[in-house]
Amino acid sequence: MSALTATIAGIGFWTDGLPDWDAATAFARDGVRPDTAPARPAPQLLAPNERRRAPGSVAVALEVALAACRAADRDPATLPSVFASTHGDLAITDYMCETLATDPTAVSPTKFHNSVHNAAAGYWTIGAGCTEAATAISAFDGTFAQGLL
């Protein structure tokens, strides 16, 4: 069996209070957070209407994917992609289960649209104008490793 090798050409990062890789490395080095950081990323790949409609998990996925492409100087429209999530969007899953159990006719069409596991991959291909292969994967504790494979 031969060893697998990989190269990281670009990194994207986002979490509350640390909106990019530079902020994250500065925090790790100095313990200082930026004075201002957005509460939620605003993925520039999406039109304003789609940006408002996209759930937070999709906004983060698109923000970090685009940042990684920019850091690698790669055009996102030309790249196949893998979006990996341990649980998907739990807030939407919880909403869907509760609403279907209590008042099925009240399900929001937008939330229903975003309840699928491949929502981030779909928004990515539309926003980036990418016609390359896009995959969404979930493997619980093995999600990160499976996403790399």
Predicted regions located by residue number:
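A contiguous pocket-lining binding segment that forms or flanks enzyme active sites
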Residues: A145-L149
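Conserved "HGTGT" condensation-loop signature of ketosynthase/thiolase-family condensing enzymes
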Residues: M1-T135, G142
